[in-house]
Amino acid sequence: MKQFKLRQLLPVLAFSFFISCQSSDKEKTSKETIPAKTDPLAKASRENKNGWVYVHLEGSPSDIGYQHGYLLSNEIDTTIQALSYYLEHETKKDWAFYRQCARNFLWDKLDREYKDEINGIAAGLHAKQKNYDSLDITALNAMEELAFYYVPQLMDKEKAGSGDNKAPGNCSAFIATGSYTKDGKIVIGHNNWTEYIIGQHWNVIADVVPEKGNHMLMDCMPGFIHSGDDFVITSNGILITETTITGFKGFDTTGIPEFQRARKSAQYSNSIDDVIRIFNTGNNGGYANDWLIGDTKTNEVAKLELGLKDYRVWRSKDTAMIGSNFPSDPKLIADETTFKVNDKSSSPNARKMRMEKLVTNLKGKLDVETGEQIEADHYDAYHNVKINNKCVICGHIDEDKNGCAEWDLPAYYPMGAVQGKVTTADLAKDMKFWAHMGHPCGQDFIGAPFYKLHPQYAWQAKYLVEMKSYPWTLFEAKK
């Protein structure tokens, strides 16, 4: 009996010890300890379902972090291994470089709340014998803004133009309301475009109940304190998603990391205005996006196009707004991107044509079912053909002989749509959304035959074996 009680206390003791000891070069990264009899896992849970890992995280920032690190320890470990391997190959920067960035200009910009949560994740990992610290978790959360915004800036300093087309082409999305939807209320959908070696890990559904702010339900990668791709609904009726801005260039190391602004906008926004304000406060230009935002309380939707120097907002209670990695504001395009507005053969512009036609044709019919159809669509509006390539909403660059030059991806690069989500105002009020892991069209990616056909990508086989497609699944936050 004494041995059993000791085993029960081990996670608690490990958590208390780690949180009290964890530190960075400049400060103690957490001074919080918890009472010896408190179980940080008491309110947490985990469930595997149709390719997703659902986790319920609840409590103080330290508790939420510990629950996250403990319950997803293996997934975080595997993700960091794959990510560090991928980044070293593609950006020519090793994991030590990204940790150094976290130390030099990210950690000190974080709010105490998020430092405590990150320290908690590291504590949970240590309790499961995974040797990562707060710098690893910070670098993981900032992977997009560091690898594809900061590193290209360094490249340009060495050779002008060498950092062009490095901003990723992540995602297709829409948000609609009013006469465009079946019930006149908001419908929102998003599919995630990512390199498969990374995108296969974007398979967490995080149900987060913090001590302060909104209850959040979102998809994310293991170890993320934000959604990252992004798709999040909140208990206050705020819905947020995005697509990246192709050809964007700009990064300010003195600003607040994008991953904190994204998390904070979901956790503390009560209105569309709040989301816009939080994203603009301390903006570092990292992971520059067109943010699609909805408020179920007012039935209004908005698009926030946010660069580093420029931003613009569009709002309406009767519209369908789309995103496929194209910027819209002429000033932002001219000032901060290399985007080719008139190149209709590019992935962003071809998908824009298709999505505009779909939301017009489906006016008055948009709901979960039609949203799922949009995310799985395979019609190339530029070539007027049904096909698997870079120009379709459910992207398959791994089958495109031309690759995707606008994102600096060569022919047949294993990248495309890796998962999807959709919800309605009524579902969101109950903290529910539908999610699909793997290509929304239902097609599997199997590594062995792919590497045989395209041996230039066999280096990825170490961490990318397959990416299976699963059924659409309804997820619901715990009440």
Predicted features along the sequence, with ranges:
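Extended amphipathic alpha-helical segments with heptad-repeat/coiled-coil character used for oligomerization
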Residues: 300-342
